[in-house]
């Protein structure tokens, strides 16, 4: 099972029968301990700073239901369905480990909701990221007790209305079940998993745009040679250099370094004096440094995938139920610092792709440095026609906005809960910002690739490499040569629609042979 397939592809989930028996055994063990009054957090105590309040067994369901209702305190806009599905998928997987005390019936009901497209309404704001994602997961769990609201087929309705139509029965929770549902990192991890998937696609698009612009600008092939890049020792740099060679193979537009040297020699061979030429031995950084810039982006994504995948497959509850009350682990597995820091790293990597794309766009448009292309790629009479001048404003403004979004969240802890939660991760904030960055950089790359498609009309289009010609062909169908005859926003939206939807994902994957694990995989067994 992989998160993206369930969240975006709407693939259903099926719970492993053998693992459910382990879940049941742990659940029954906790119910017995609760009746025997073994002191255990969330079983017979209050929550958070109220841990010193002991709750007798007759209030077991009240305690759990009160937790869900009181902590369903989220605010802001609700998450879209695909993020909600990712959250539900990760929470089911974590609870299927069998260390939380949840009942199989609760997991089956969550899975049924997921498979039938019944999505809890989960507000985006309200999580501190430790003790897990209490607010969003409380909203996720409310429908299990017949409370809250759900969204089905895009319509938000009270839970019980939908349950009655679907023949579903809400549950009465036992000892610790409410706490098991909400005391974990599954909201930030679900959101982070989607951000990671989108970031990987943006990296492929960044490579395609980079391979396009070096041809449009007749850049040198030398910066992408294996020998020089391998000496830097970073594997990501070597991979990106190889991909740049692959994506530009067969081009008739780039310049060989030996040819550049020869041209300089011929230009200066008859003079022994200082002489300024119009020939540049090296290109500007935005045409030369892709292996170094995108190489570290690649390695950052790989590191973040490890953190996020490990968290998605972890036991992130508290307490963690072991064989006896004495062994049961009262700790802090709910803390989201791994995911929070992974998202901060990921947000910087995504923002850097936006920085590169914005600078490449400027080099493509600036009439002082983009020769022989027309200024701002105007189709005729530059000045009367503006070309992509307006599109650049959008890209530049978003790149600036991204600098704020890329600031770390994981170090911005504010104590809460009577000083009990005195160092928290803010992991869901970090994940939300990373999702926003992915949207923003997708727009910057859409402007750049629309401009590159325009630039191909002013160059020898047949001399581009095969992968880039296929991109131009695809984009040309929705965004033909721009002649100021329609709003620029329409062009950008059309290109964005191609690049960032499923057809764009498939095309980029087919063209960019990037060895990334394709999915964030889940394993319900411990």
From Swiss-Prot:
It catalyses: L-tyrosine = 3-amino-3-(4-hydroxyphenyl)propanoate; L-tyrosine = (E)-4-coumarate + NH4(+). PANTHER family: HISTIDINE AMMONIA-LYASE. Keywords: Isomerase, Lyase. It comes from Myxococcus fulvus. InterPro entries: Aromatic_Lyase, Fumarase/histidase_N, L-Aspartase-like, Phe/His_NH3-lyase_AS. The keyword Lyase applies. This is Tyrosine 2,3-aminomutase. Has aminomutase and, to a much lesser extent, ammonia-lyase activity. Primarily, catalyzes the rearrangement of L-tyrosine to S-beta-tyrosine, which is probably incorporated into secondary metabolite myxovalargin. The aminomutase activity exclusively produces S-beta-tyrosine. The lineage of its organism: Bacteria, Pseudomonadati, Myxococcota, Myxococcia, Myxococcales. SUPFAM superfamilies: L-aspartase-like.
